[in-house]
């Protein structure tokens, strides 16, 4: 990295890091109630997390509030 960005920082203390994104093997997010009364899932969006955030959040709020989501989600 130093050869591409000389003088950009102190590389001596640098370490490798990866910001992994949770996703399911099928690439379909998990949104819905679980067998645990106080646990609701809205995860597994992978690289589309920000893209799907508003729609998934709204669907999650509807489901938690026992309302039918506006959009039909086949993966709920």
Say what each PLM segment does.
Residues 2-76:
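C-terminal catalytic lobe of FAD-dependent flavoproteins
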């Amino acid at each position: 990295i130093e050869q591409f960005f000389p003088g950009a920082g102190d590389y001596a203390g640098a370490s490798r890091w990866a910001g992994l994104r949770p996703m399911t093997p099928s690439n379909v997010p998990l949104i819905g109630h679980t067998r645990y009364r106080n646990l609701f899932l809205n995860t597994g969006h992978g690289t589309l997390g920000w893209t799907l955030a508003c729609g998934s959040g709204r669907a999650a709020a509807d489901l938690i509030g026992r309302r039918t989501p506006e959009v039909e989600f086949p993966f709920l």
